[in-house]
Amino acid sequence: MKETNFGEKTRVLVVGGTGSLGRRIVSACLAEGHETYVLQRPEIGVDIEKVQLLLSFKRLGAHLVEGSFSDHQSLVSAVKQVDVVVSAMSGVHFRTHNIPVQLKLVAAIKEAGNVKRFLPSEFGMDPSRMGHAMPPGSETFDQKMEIRNAIKAAGISHTYLVGACFAAYFGGNLSQMGTLFPPKNKVDIYGDGNVKVVFVDEDDMAKYTAKTLNDPRTLNKTVYVRPTDNILTQMELVQIWEKLTEKELEKTYVSGNDFLADIEDKEISHQAGLGHFYHIYYEGCLTDHEVGDDEEATKLYPDVKYKRMDEYLKIFV
């Protein structure tokens, strides 16, 4: 098993382990050798796919721990069994938005008193740099900062993983709206298409999470995930696809003003996501700052052979 600096096994509890990223984090923690626990919440009810997923984790050696956000003591009992807690609660507005519920997790960790480190659900844009974000999407960053402030107030050691767009949502579709597949003939280009964006495969984000959670170099730090070969402009991403398919797409250039005007007609939940999109593709919020005194995942863990976007896109050809 993976050892901590204190010569103990690293016991990790993953909260949100049946979600798209959470299930990958569970698998990565098991592969890394961590003694892995997964919170089994009664809210899954008779969701057979989630039940079967939990049982598959158990077969691989994970421990299932019962706990509910409506039962504080059950959460305290769950976190008392581990050294590290990783949250992968969804922050997607148009599906489920569970960021605020992590306050209950913070309270449980504080009361338990034994958790050496907490990794809250972040993974995307650094909320500490998004004070200028437009509403209603700003709510996500406000809530993530509320979680961070609660962590600080409780004196809980932590690591924040941030800084990239998940390839499943932003890469395979060449950053197009309303689809997760590449366009066949036409593609919308945001602005001039030359703003740098960071893409990462979700499996790789999970691997970095599993590696950083007990690394003394990342304690009480922000870890940016910036795979060098995946720091691309949208135009570069499109050109990779055109090279793979040997077909040039018809390009429509969407100005920032037109993009913002189009947002106004959408439902609130979609306005939030599109606002984030604007900050990424027009303002370059993922790449407009240096790492500084914090850390960067690919430099810390060069042994992780991350998936480049040219490799990622091949499955769609």
From Swiss-Prot:
Single GO MF annotation: pinoresinol reductase activity
Keyword NADP attributed: yes
Transmembrane segments: none
Alphabetized SUPFAM superfamilies for the sequence: NAD(P)-binding Rossmann-fold domains
Domain of life, source organism: Eukaryota
Residues that coordinate or bind (-)-pinoresinol: M125, G178
Sequence positions that bind NADP(+): T18, S20, L21, R41, K50, S90, G91, R95, N98, S121, K144, F166
Keyword NADP assigned: yes
Tissue distribution of the protein: Expressed in roots. Detected in stems.
Pfam families in alphabetical order: NmrA (PF05368)
Alphabetical keyword list: NADP, Oxidoreductase
Biological process terms in GO annotation: lignan biosynthetic process
Recorded family membership: Belongs to the NmrA-type oxidoreductase family. Isoflavone reductase subfamily.
Function: Reductase involved in lignan biosynthesis. Unlike conventional pinoresinol reductases that can reduce both pinoresinol and lariciresinol, PRR2 shows a strict substrate selectivity for (-)-pinoresinol. No activity with (+)-pinoresinol or lariciresinol. Abstracts the 4R-hydride from the NADPH cofactor during catalysis.
Quaternary structure and partners: Forms homodimers.
Protein name according to UniProt: Pinoresinol reductase 2
